[in-house]
Amino acid sequence: MQDVELVDVGGTGAARDPVALAGRHRRTARPGRSRTPLRRWAVVSLTVMLVAGGAVGAGLAAGGYPARPRAAAGMLHPVDDPPWTRWHAPVPRSDDLLAADGVLLGTSVREGRFRVTAWDVATGGRRWDQDLGPVAGTRPLTGCLPDRDGTSAVVVCVVEPPVVPTDPARPSTVPFPAPDERWARVSALDAATGAVLSTSTLVGRLAAVERLADDVVVLSIAPDGHPQVARYSAEGGHLRWWYRGDEPLRLRSGIVSGSELRVDDAFVLVQGWSASVLDAADGSVITTGTPQWYTIGALAQGVFGTWSSGQGGTVRDRSGAELFRSSALFPSFTATDQQPPDVLVLDSGGSVVGRSLPDGDELWRLDTYRAVRLRVDGKLVLVGVDGYQVADVRTGDVLWQTPGRTLMWWAPLTDGRLVLSAGRTGSGTPTIEARRLADGALEWSLPVPDGVRAVTEVGGHLVLRTRDEILLLQ
């Protein structure tokens, strides 16, 4: 039995109100929604009966799980009311979590074998458990690949079986250290049943595998050190396209040093001693950089960026043509809806900069020690170790910030209307605090259950993790 308490946030007081207009802001150019009134929650205690092994509270067992879509990957499904623990399941924190259509998945290696377990999102009941065979002792590629939205009906997993010793009669012909040639098995599973839909095999000096829709994109190293990138269908392993780089990757101490593969709906970015940007649809080369290039990643739809020590950052359009240069770097968003699409946000180290697309005019500059992490509904959430602030994407104006100082021991999350973050009561009890993105007003606050070590988003679901359990809140 577990008590879930809603902390009273009624009345007025300093702890309730956000602090507005913090940080030094310089607007270079100023181009030109209120929500429903704050709902005040009385102190309530909800006693939830939890069945061992992960059953739901009896009152909601028959109810359907709301399936309203998120605005963007990395965001929570809409949180209309204070959430409560819908179910819990035994999952060690060392296991990886991901989501698929109607299920939450845990992957693990137990006794040298790779296993995937699926729990029904609505009930917490175990749907299926699949053993995908033995794995190698070192398994950098082994795992299930999350799809962008966590809603695919296909689960794609890669397993590296134990390495077979090299045949002395066939020594390696690689002229410098490189990853050993090995093979990996790609399995496509039905998310609803766990049934194996198909298996295929990857062979070569494998460096990285990423998922793109229901396909896999594979980076391998040719015997002469050149990168090879291929896109295969996860079901059946059919080749979509193949690319070989003109420049060898940088190799060191038997590994591919600094190599990286990034994918999104528009681009495939291959980074090593040089950088190449490929069209995700057909593998055609959009641009290939000099050996001094460093590929940062896609920034927005149809726009990507590169960086070099000599030129700094360069923003490029869909064809690879240079739009403008900037010494600022490109922030790593945990969630973004890319709105508005004609404003690019850059991190200049000690300040955040807004620039227009496609011309690159500087619109505003905000001096802050906090880092941009969320971009949604025309607003930025900038996070520091002691709190966060919300700024307008078009103007750079700081709209509000969290009152006081609270250790952000987990990264703030959003559903597009609320920002959920770490909070603390006057007595020091850790809480989950929900503030309206529009104005910072506190809507509710929930105590964090004992033993919780992480609060995160998995496929749009709010998930808490202890050392040996997961708790799904709804």
Feature-to-residue mapping (PLM):
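Secretory-pathway ectodomains
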Residues: 2-474
